[in-house]
Amino acid sequence: IPGIVKDEVKPQVHTWTFADGKKIIVLSEGRLLNLGNATGHPSFVMSNSFADQTLAQIELYTKPEQYPTDVYVLPKHLDEKVARLHLDALGVKLTTLRPEQAEYIGVEVEGPYKPDHYRY
């Protein structure tokens, strides 16, 4: 546009200067900020979050009778499933509890390993 100057301040941050000298700052060229300026969360963290959301949606869809309209905390078994799905990306191998170990800490061998009230 004639008379307007666009300057890059840093990636995804631009100033637009109008002919009268007034300026505006435009972030992400007007796109969604959390996508265009995503510098806060690495992809691994986002993958965990999206996996939690996806498993929660599947749980709600396949078991609607267990979830009347309300707000729920993600069940521990699903949270632990997401963690297990991401172990390879960390180069981690997880062993299975022996029955006596599970009994000692008061959980089932297959989990979940934390009580429902526990918050990570």
From Swiss-Prot:
Ribosomal protein keyword on record: no
EC annotation from Swiss-Prot or TrEMBL: 3.13.2.1
Record's protein name: Adenosylhomocysteinase
Top-level EC class: hydrolase
Main function: May play a key role in the regulation of the intracellular concentration of adenosylhomocysteine.
Gene Ontology process terms (BP): one-carbon metabolic process; S-adenosylmethionine cycle
Pathway the protein takes part in: Amino-acid biosynthesis; L-homocysteine biosynthesis; L-homocysteine from S-adenosyl-L-homocysteine: step 1/1
Catalysed reaction equations from the record: S-adenosyl-L-homocysteine + H2O = L-homocysteine + adenosine
Pfam families xrefs: AdoHcyase, AdoHcyase_NAD
Record's GO cellular component terms: cytosol
